A protein has these predicted regions:
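Hydrophobic anchor at the beta1->P-loop junction of P-loop NTPases
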Residues: 47-49
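Conserved lysine of the Walker
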Residues: 57
Length: 179
């Protein structure tokens, strides 16, 4: 049985479309359940996470990695720029996930020096980028945008928006909209 998030829908862009939705997360368990849903919504591709410092971007990513099957710790890539993960899959093989934090990036060209663009060559990889706005002219367009706004110590408003690339790839937020 699938866990159903217990978060409140603030708004959807249209009841017949599934390209954008806003959610209100009231507990950390809501964040964990959202991450479990994201595993099925976007199994691969690029996701841009935005939000103020402390909004919950790394927390969402940690739960997302755990929902994918990662067993170890999840470190914030603030100082390393990128934390790569190889997550064993039930069917065999592994899934590549790259968690990047570009907050401290001085020049987007730094990404080419570390081979960041190569991560996008794997069609099965999931690339989660915090502070992508620091290099938005360098990065390929994402499949999904997630913006997190901290309303209080316990509440966060999360806006999820599929890009045209995400819609073209057949992604849908309908799962979240029906809950």
């Amino acid at each position: 049985m699938t866990n159903v998030p217990n978060f409140s829908k603030v708004e959807a862009s249209d009841s017949t479309k599934s390209d954008a939705i806003q959610l209100l997360l009231s507990t950390e368990a809501d964040t964990q359940l959202l991450a479990q849903q994201l595993v099925t919504i976007i199994p691969s591709g690029s996701v841009w996470l935005s939000g103020d410092l402390g909004a919950g971007k790394t927390t969402l990513t940690r739960y997302w990695l755990q929902a994918l099957g990662h067993q170890g710790s999840v470190k914030s890539p603030t100082y390393t720029l990128v934390e790569p993960y190889q997550i064993a899959q039930v069917a065999g093989g592994s899934k590549s996930v790259y968690h990047a934090d570009l907050y401290r990036l001085q020049d987007p060209e730094e990404l080419s020096f570390i081979g960041f663009d190569e991560y996008f060559n794997d069609p099965n990889a999931l690339i989660i980028i915090e502070w992508a706005s620091q290099a938005d002219e360098y990065l390929p367009a994402p499949h999904l945008f997630i913006d997190i706004t901290q309303l209080s110590n316990h509440q966060r408003q999360v806006h999820l928006q599929l890009s045209k690339i995400g819609i073209h790839a057949g992604l849908s937020l309908a799962t979240l909209m029906s809950n």
